């Protein structure tokens, strides 16, 4: 969902499926925040982002999936006793490893926007106007 989208010409793009949310806070300082997986984090971070987004600052909010780690389950020992005579067969069974997705991380990026300052041109012929 979107949070505070469209203040001051701000643009909010929410990417579903990819898990990425972009919020451009240009033109009044308030932009939309695209929430992909963590709405509580987005709600808590919305006022701070809106205030911090000065007209000279572009704040992008991305929701990046957390680090996926490989979880190796412990091996299972199977014992089998065959009678008679007492024969003990012990097998070590290793289950396949599972890929566990970690919690999503919300990354706030502040990129200074490019501000073109007007360079005053040297005023030629200024003294000639005074004569």
UniProtKB/Swiss-Prot annotation:
Repeat (Sequence) residue spans along the chain: 37-40, 45-48, 53-56
Keywords: Cuticle, Repeat
Molecular function GO terms recorded: structural constituent of cuticle
Superkingdom assignment: Eukaryota
Role played: Component of the cuticle of migratory locust which contains more than 100 different structural proteins.
Record's comment describing the protein's domains: The tetrapeptide (A-A-P-[AV]) repeats found throughout the protein are also present in many proteins constituting the protective envelope of other species.
Descriptive protein name: Cuticle protein 79, isoform A
Species of the source: Locusta migratoria (Migratory locust)
